[in-house]
Amino acid sequence: MKQFLMIMVMIATAFISSGQEANFTGKVKDEQGKALSGATISIKGSKVKTQTNTNGLFSIKATIGDMLVVSFSGFSNQSYTLKNSNPIDIQLSVSNNDLNEVVVLGTRSVGRTKLESVSPVDVFDLKTLTSEVPQTNLTDILNHVAPSFNSTTQTVADGTDHVDPATVRGLGPDQTLVLINGKRRYTSALVNVNGTMGRGSVGTDLNAIAAASIDKIELLRDGAAAQYGSDAIAGVINIQLNKNIGTGKAVFSSGANITTYQSYKQAAPGSFKLGETYPCQFCINDPKYYNNSVMDGRKTNASVNYGWQIGKTKASFINVTLNMEQREPTIRSGERTGDIDNRKSGDSASNALMTALGVDRNYFQMRVGQSRTRNLQGVINGALALKKGGEFYFFSILSNRVGNSTGFYRMPYQNSNIPAIYPNGFLPEITSNINDISLGTGLKGKMGTWNYDLSNTYGQNSFGFNIENTLNVSAYYNNQSKQSEFDAGTLLFRQNTTNIDFSKKLDNAINLNVAYGAELRYENYQQKAGEEASWANYMRKTGGVTDVLNGTPTSIKLADNTTGIPAGGAQVFPGFRPDNAKNESRTSTALYVDFEMEPIKKLLLDFAGRYENYSDFGGNLSGKVAGRYKLSDNIALRGSLSTGFRAPALQQRYLTKTSTVFQGGVAYDDATLPNDSKAAQALGIPSLRPEISNSASIGTTLKINKFSLTVDAYSTKITDRIILTDAFSGSATGDAVSQLLYTTLLANNAARGIFMANATDLRTSGIDIISAYNLKMPKKQSLKFEVATTLSKREILGKTKVSEKLLGRESTYMSPINKATLIDGNPKVKGYLSLSYKKDDFNLFLRNTYFGEVTHIEGGGTTNWFYVQVLSPKIVTDLSIGYKLNKSWRFSTGANNLFDIYSDLLVASRGSYKRLDVVPTSPTYDKFVESQSAFQRGVVNNNGISSNNQFNYSRRVTQLGMNGRYLYARIEITF
């Protein structure tokens, strides 16, 4: 009987103890034994979860018999049933399945996967992508893997040739916030001012960050200003740097564009018929077109990455990346058409001059295509584990880029040339020196029961302009100066951001996670003047003495035998004047709060609010509510409503410059004047206001085994979108406003003035569809399919917000070209289908990317006629094949744009276009009138449309670029 009672007591004790909660501790590590910081441990069937500290250690309240589920980004989930109270040692294995990828973007809670997030988040494994895909820089990679992301190199666009603008969901480059390791990244000092994508915006230079230094990228496709602050209207990009230790990789790749592009021949009037648009691609025997086979754009990239453990714990580390890339230019211009001799018109005069010079029409070809660049980058990422689970972390990114691009060719007897210096004319060059410096440091850990994160991030971008192979026409006429190289000045932007963040998961019925924090940000924009000869007009005289600032322009006989005022400043890019110099600063403070909860089973809600106050324009309050409802283990619904804003950039407020712009082959000096200038005030243009956004999204997620599908519909309305106007011109004999404008422009060495203004409202809406399937394969094989697409619509709402003094001049305030670039300059439909196959040491990657139609619009100038061409959709194929030669060496080769696809050629005849009547009250630009006039019918008149056959492909819109097929080879060495 005693034995029976003893057994019953033991059973009862075990039963009682099994139902009691206790603290269970353990450690999570990878296959090499390295501690995994940030791994999520949850109790299956419960809302209870925790996260490992920097040493991989965790503690969780549970009971004997509970099943723990351990997850970490890039690793397979592992389950563990609690059998006793002994410390738990869990080792995770690397996974090829990214369906359970844990994200930190869009949530301040821990352990959310991208399918569990209340907002759509894409996760891109850069370590895999940089081994598989042909692209090497960040914007190129993202342009082919994220349908909602668009970016291509720009051409003949001043500084924008050297910094690729990037957009999300077709909005502006400045409406997407970029984070590094969760901390705000600064923007470029450059404002995009020429007639290409992102005109008037200030973006972030993603290519200043070496792709080899990145572990993964998260792309939040939802308004998030209430969570992260200004700029997060279209979404947020979070770049997470490498943390690996004890292993390294060196990569060398080289390739070139081996391609055939088409261009028009010099042709006689009437050889193109009305309605004839562009030729079929590769019409080899068509006498109207050249098929130009070239090999150019050679690119060489070398990088090395390695991580070291610091001290005894693997939670303390430093990871270093060095990267170098040399990129040569591409040329996609055609045989120059039109007059060669500006003194006389007609082919006879042109042929006679070319014979005398010993050249042909191709000699005067422009360099239309990608610029030449050389990039040097260094990236450091590290952390030091502190006692009691704390961590000191740091990261730094250094980058230097030297770029070289060109402008329009100056013909031998054009007024912008001096034949005594350049008998054959010249192609002026813009050489950039772009430097990026950033340093982020922080301290995080626990303060009582709260998690804290105190950080400071500093960053700056400088953009120096050196103008080469050029001249100052007025300097030669003044004192026979033959100076051909000029320091045109420097732009500088600096930003310092200090954050303090707190968060806590409350152990209560609704599983509430509370986060709050504050931010202090300082910004400074500087514009440094160039040397005098870069901007001065030396033919401005006072009493016969040169007076470059206040003198009266003197007319003389110019190169084309006409009499006029010689141009001042360096041709292609006149430098910044001393009175253009700026040194402007501002501060902003912010407070935010975020509540994430599960009020009922299967429902996750998130509420966020943020108040920001700027020293230059005041405050803004943004809010967001988002939710996710789990219909079953496999299907969930999610949606969000949010408000947001974007503060006008200091660069937009204070940029002052003069640039040479061509319309219809005619050169103009355009002055971009500050928003607070006398000229802007005279025109009634108000001070810049923040852009305000209202966003809504609804979607669904599906996960069945190794298949996932997300479908998200969205709509974002933006009020008071900031744009760069077209050029206003004044008159010495006009009304008071016109006279003041004339005087102000003349003082800026320009004939026309451009301004920043809150000019319009717009809406973008669409659907994003993303699916992935990891096919079950035999051992040592894997096969993954991905299909993704975005369908979007952008529209301008209401009338242009023109000032009262400019009523009737809406088409200058916001031209049809500007409208077209905003709403039709990016593909509204874009998608891809990719296949990735691996077997043992062999891998194959195949991807087809669909770029939808875009609209090119040209015209204006001295007429009210605009010409519209819709460029048809294209499919670009990428292919790469790789083989692991041994334990350390891997070789791969392949192609970007395997079948050498180009956008449609711009049409050669104005008769091929539709005429657009300018309707000032029309919010769009789609009121066409088919013209049958003799001027348009059957006449080759592409000189004005494509600038003498130099722009065969559109430079205004962003579809798929204009480089053609790119072939490459890559060697990777792991050590």
Walk through the language-model features, giving the residues of each.
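Outer-membrane beta-barrel transmembrane domain signature of Gram-negative proteins
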Residues: 426-441, 445-446, 458, 470-604, ...
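C-terminal beta-signal and adjacent terminal beta-strands/loops
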Residues: 718, 793, 849-860, 883-975
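Short acidic/polar hinge/loop motifs at secondary-structure boundaries
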Residues: 58-61, 184-221, 270
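N-terminal periplasmic accessory domains that precede
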Residues: 86-91, 138-141, 145, 166, ...
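Short, acidic, small-residue-rich periplasmic hinge/interaction motif at the N-terminus
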Residues: 27-34, 39-44, 67-75, 83-131
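Surface-exposed extracellular loop regions of Gram-negative outer-membrane beta-barrel proteins
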Residues: 245-265, 288, 342-355, 359, ...
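Gram-negative outer-membrane beta-barrel transporters
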Residues: 713-719, 725-858
